[in-house]
Every structure is written in structure tokens, then in C-alpha cells.
Regions:
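C-terminal, non-catalytic "cap/extension" segments appended to globular domains
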Residues: 112-122, 208, 216, 246, ...
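His/Asp/Glu-rich acidic catalytic environments and adjacent acidic regulatory segments
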Residues: 1-87, 91, 95-98, 145, ...
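Short pre-active-site segment immediately N-terminal to the catalytic Zn-binding motif
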Residues: 195-208
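A short, hydrophobic C-terminal helix/tail in secreted or cell-surface proteins
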Residues: 409-413
């Protein structure tokens, strides 16, 4: 697939690719954003029929295995690994539908702040604050900031965090031949290992908190569980990491300047948008395409494009001007080839906001329950572990609170 060169506002050619698309979308150069958006989407549009057939075939394979293993459908088959009832999946979509107003308000607010007559999909990622560089600090200072932010988790967590810092669990900096990004790897009987590519900016500080959340989840689980029960599910994995991110943000807000607060709150609002709303939008699309296959129909590009445009209108509201090119976006989402996976991002984020809120509000035994959750590993089904710790995802409350309380409060500020 060959993507075009596009012009920026200075008339210079800029490469468009999946690798730099997000970088272009966060540029303050609106012409570059617009041209990158149209260049990428029109390229995918050329292959719309091939990609629709590929996705259709993938769904048929999943449906075959679901039937062969005596499941009602692909949804039930995919959720069975974590013992998640399909009603939770449907309830998640329904709850987000009932709470789309905060997202509509956020899009309208961002349109107003940016002073745009029309707000397009290529405007969504534009920063509304230039304060990112003001958070620059070296790694030693980043460790101090993360340690202070996570102090509400108590002595045991602090001691384990300090052990990770002191005993060099972390490969910190970019290096020749080193992979990009960041991740944590837990190994039973050995301390966790963390890979970073640290840069002096807030996102890297947040990544440190995030990955140490994974690492200490593994640390407490391995310390408390047998080998068989030590490995926690993906459904639970992002809870520990995201809780740390939220605690860091709340801590940083306390001493932030007005401009820094705008940056931080926008970071949080974007996290809610991309991790809850957008992932549930994906989850709803997945349900649609697999239902089509279950009904014996083949996925057609026109059908998928129509559904995707309607979905964006519903989710983002009247403040978003929906361009025709947006219809092709479904074809560039690789998660759709791993059926019914993305909903876990939304449930994980919602659980994390519930834990962080309870901890910061000093609710009775909130820290004790949370640490018990970390130490429980995979000793029970995910929903049971979370419910024991005080977060019941079989009810709409955690998702509703995430959509309403956090998003609305942040937008108001």
C-alpha cells in the first residue's frame, strides 16, 4: 500500500504513513492535518473491497470455530475465556450510548477553544495547550514525581516501587537496536523487567507510572500466588497501570500552572475519549459485523462505510463535521482481526477510575482492597476479583462515573 506525499502550509512535501499519521494529526498545521487525513483515507478507499472481503473472511473463520466448539456465536466464544457474560458487553455499549452527552460537549468545547467554524476528524488530535515542554525533567526527577504520586497506595507499594528503582528493573533510555515503545514483563520467581525509551516530557513520566503499575501487579501476584495462579488476565492487566496514570495526573494537577492544567486535563479528556468512547465504538462495530456474518451475509464495503459514518455522527455529535473520507477509517483498524478484544480497554479504564477515586477519597479499606486485587493474580475470574475489590463491572456504575463525573468535571475546569 503506497501512501502519497502531501503538502503542509509552507508548501513542503510531507510523507504520510501509518507510522507518522498520529504525529501529523497532532501538528498545529491544519493544512498538514487535513491533507494527511485525506491522503491516508483515500489510499485505504482504493482497497475497500479487498479489505472488506479480508475482514469478512476473518469473521467467518471465527464463526466456524465458535460453532465447532458449541458456542452460540463468536461473541460468546471470545468472552468465555474470561468467563464474561455477553450481557456485560451489551450493557457496556448501552451505558456509553446513554452517556454520549459529555463527549458531544467535549467536541463542542474543543471546537470553540480552537476557534474553528467547522470541526473535522482531523482536528480532534490538535493540542489546545503548548505546555508539554514545561514538564521536562530527567529520569531521577521523574522517579521522585511518580513515587510522590503513588504514595496514597501505602508503605508496601512504596517499598516495592523503590525496590524496582534501586535494583534496576528498568532499561531506561533509547539505544541502538532497542525496540520502540514501552512494556513490562513479569517472570515468575524473578523480579519484573521494564523497558522504556524515556524522553524528558510528561508522557514519558506517565509511561513510567503506567509500566511500573504492570510491574508491581506482577510483583505482588508472583509473591502471593502459585505459578498456576500468578498470571493475571488481560481484562485485569490495564487496571493496575491506568490507576497509576490517574494518580499521577491528579497529583501533578495540584501544583500545575493554569496553562499546565489545561494540558493535563486535555490529556485526561483524550484518554477517556480514546480508551472508553472510541473503544466502545469499535466494540459496537465488531458486534455489527459479526452479526452480519451470523445472519449469513457477506461484508460489503458500502455497508461498512455507511455504518461507520453513522457511528461517528452518533458518537461525536453535531459539533463534528463528518467528511466522506472518514467512511474508510474502519479498514485501517487492526484490532478488528482479533474479535471482541477492544472492549477490555474501556472496562479496564473504568475500573481504574473507580479504584483511583476510592483511593484518593480515602474510602474505607480502599487501598487494602486494591492491593489485595493486585496480589490475587489469576486466582479467580476477572469479574470476581474486581468485585471483591469493590468494582462491579456487571453494573453500569463504573462506566457511567467515568463518562460523567470525570469527563464533565474536567471539561468544566
Amino acid at each position: 500500500m503506497q501512501f502519497p506525499l502531501v503538502k503542509n502550509s509552507e508548501g513542503l512535501d510531507v510523507t504520510v504513513s501509518e507510522g507518522n499519521y498520529l504525529l501529523n494529526m497532532t501538528s498545529n498545521d491544519r493544512l498538514l492535518r487535513r491533507n494527511s487525513f485525506k491522503g491516508l483515507m483515500t489510499t485505504y478507499h482504493k482497497y475497500r473491497n479487498t479489505l472488506a472481503n479480508t475482514l469478512s473472511s476473518n469473521c467467518r473463520v471465527s464463526a466456524f470455530y465458535a460453532t465447532a466448539h458449541k458456542y452460540h456465536d463468536t461473541l460468546e466464544a471470545c468472552l468465555s475465556e474470561d468467563n464474561i457474560p455477553p450481557s456485560l458487553y451489551d450493557g457496556l455499549i448501552e451505558t456509553v450510548h446513554e452517556n454520549l452527552k459529555p463527549l458531544h460537549e467535549y467536541i463542542a468545547l474543543k471546537k470553540e477553544i480552537l476557534g474553528l467554524d467547522e470541526f473535522h476528524a482531523y482536528d480532534i488530535y490538535q493540542p489546545i495547550s503548548n505546555a508539554a515542554d514545561s514538564f521536562a525533567c530527567d529520569f531521577d526527577e521523574a522517579k521522585v514525581k511518580v513515587t510522590a504520586a503513588l504514595s496514597p497506595l501505602g508503605y508496601d507499594y512504596h517499598a516495592a516501587l523503590q525496590e524496582g528503582f534501586d535494583k534496576q528493573w528498568i532499561d531506561i533510555y533509547e539505544n541502538k537496536g532497542k525496540r520502540s515503545g514501552a512494556y513490562s514483563w513479569g517472570i515468575y520467581g524473578v523480579h519484573p523487567y521494564v523497558l522504556l525509551n524515556y524522553q524528558p516530557r510528561y508522557n514519558s513520566i506517565s509511561t513510567l507510572a503506567h509500566e511500573m503499575g504492570h510491574a508491581l501487579h506482577s510483583y505482588f501476584s508472583n509473591k502471593s500466588q502459585t505459578y498456576i495462579n500468578s498470571d493475571y488476565s488481560i481484562f485485569c492487566a490495564e487496571v493496575a497501570s491506568t490507576t497509576n496514570e490517574i494518580l499521577l495526573l491528579e497529583h501533578t494537577l495540584k501544583t500545575a500552572s493554569p496553562e499546565q492544567k489545561i494540558y493535563l486535563l486535555n490529556q485526561f479528556l483524550e484518554a477517556v475519549r480514546t480508551t472508553v468512547y472510541r473503544q466502545v465504538q469499535f466494540a459496537e462495530f465488531e458486534k455489527f459485523i459479526h452479526n452480519e456474518i451470523n445472519e449469513g451475509r457477506t461484508l460489503q464495503a458500502e455497508m461498512l462505510e455507511t455504518y461507520w459514518l453513522d457511528s461517528n455522527k452518533r458518537y461525536y455529535g453535531p459539533a463534528l463535521t463528518v467528511d466522506a473520507e472518514l467512511a474508510s477509517e474502519w479498514s485501517r483498524i487492526p484490532h478488528f482481526y482479533t474479535p471482541f478484544y477492544v472492549y477490555k480497554y474501556a472496562t479496564g479504564y473504568s475500573a481504574a477510575t473507580a479504584f483511583a477515586s476510592a483511593i484518593l477519597e480515602n474510602k474505607p479499606k480502599a487501598v487494602e482492597k486494591y492491593l489485595h486485587f493486585l496480589a490475587s493474580g489469576g486466582s479467580d475470574y476477572s469479574l470476581n476479583l474486581l468485585k471483591t475489590a469493590g468494582v462491579d463491572l456487571t453494573t453500569p456504575l463504573p462506566v457511567t462515573v467515568t463518562c460523567l463525573l470525570y469527563t464533565s468535571d474536567a471539561a468544566d475546569e
